[in-house]
């Protein structure tokens, strides 16, 4: 029998997974990725990479012992992992459209897009932090054996990196939309699917906790990554929706000023 937990998991994974396709399809149909900020897609790809590693470790490398309660394990499912892996791969595809649209996708235009220097520094800083955290994690496990508390600390740090990327990545996209003063070629369908997935993800977590250990500061700390990602996604997607209502009546000529 399918439970409410499974239904919510299917809804959020399906919604978030499908939301990856409108940008790619829209860019392909219009032969341009001008509506997508390069800073956004670069930061998003890095963030998804951190998230995939974090969820993989928590799902498949969690050491079950008699001394530690399974209640301390973050409430993650197979849905979370496969959604994130799929999202990471789709972001790589979107990245090829933005970075190499003319060469790979045969988009017209010869312009070369570059990252904003500030966002490039942020990306490089996050990669440096990720490298340091990973070296420290591997060193500790090599000398002091594998321990769940150490794994959780490392995974939460990766979640923090992902949340940081999510907080920052939307800013250049919001700015990009504002600069163009147009939502032409912007995949608003993906935004609505994102909102649906974010709400379903939060409802699933609430349902899981209400049937398990209940709500407390400890459970929030343990699951703050999932809560944080859902809230950030919802907040910025509502901003995109407001921009869409403001700019949707603008003409298509403004968007043409920003070719690939």
Swiss-Prot record:
GO cellular component entries: endosome; endosome membrane; fungal-type vacuole; plasma membrane; vacuolar membrane
Membrane topology: Multi-pass membrane protein
Gene Ontology biological process terms, A to Z: L-cystine transport
Catalytic activity: L-cystine(out) + H(+)(out) = L-cystine(in) + H(+)(in)
Residues listed as glycosylation sites in the UniProt record: 177
Pfam families recorded: PQ-loop
Compartment(s) of residence: Endosome membrane; Vacuole membrane
PQ-loop domain span: 1-67, 162-212
Keyword Transmembrane helix: yes
Keyword Membrane assigned: yes
Keywords: Endosome, Glycoprotein, Membrane, Repeat, Symport, Transmembrane, Transmembrane helix, Transport, Vacuole
Principal cellular location given in the protein's record: membrane
GO MF entries: L-cystine transmembrane transporter activity; symporter activity
TM region(s), chain numbering: 7-28, 40-62, 81-102, 118-138, 151-175, 185-205, 227-247
Similarity-based family: Belongs to the cystinosin family.
Function: Cystine/H(+) symporter that mediates export of cystine, the oxidized dimer of cysteine, from vacuoles/endodomes.
Name of protein: Cystine transporter
């Amino acid at each position: 029998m399918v439970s409410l937990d499974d239904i919510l998991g299917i809804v959020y994974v399906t919604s978030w997974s499908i939301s990856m396709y409108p940008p790619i399809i829209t860019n392909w149909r219009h032969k341009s990725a001008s509506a997508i900020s390069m800073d956004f897609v670069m930061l998003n790809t890095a963030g998804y990479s951190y998230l995939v590693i974090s969820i993989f470790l928590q799902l498949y490398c969690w050491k079950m012992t008699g001394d530690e309660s399974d209640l301390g394990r973050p409430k993650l499912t197979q849905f979370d992992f496969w959604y994130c892996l799929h999202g990471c791969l789709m972001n790589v595809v979107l990245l090829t459209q933005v970075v190499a649209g003319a060469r790979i996708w045969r988009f017209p235009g010869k312009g070369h897009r570059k990252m904003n220097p500030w966002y490039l520094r942020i990306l490089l800083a996050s990669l440096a932090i990720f490298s340091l955290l990973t070296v420290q994690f591997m060193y500790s496990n090599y000398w002091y054996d594998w321990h769940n508390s150490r794994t959780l600390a490392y995974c939460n740090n990766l979640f923090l990196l992902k949340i940081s990327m999510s907080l920052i990545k939307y800013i250049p996209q919001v700015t990009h939309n504002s600069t163009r003063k147009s939502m032409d070629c912007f995949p608003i369908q993906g935004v609505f699917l994102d909102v649906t997935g974010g709400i379903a993800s939060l409802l699933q977590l609430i349902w899981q906790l209400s049937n398990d250990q209940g709500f407390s500061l400890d459970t929030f700390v343990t699951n703050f990554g999932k809560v944080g990602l859902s809230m950030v996604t919802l907040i910025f997607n509502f901003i995109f929706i407001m921009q869409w209502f403001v700019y949707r009546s603008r003409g298509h000529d403004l968007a043409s000023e920003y070719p690939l």
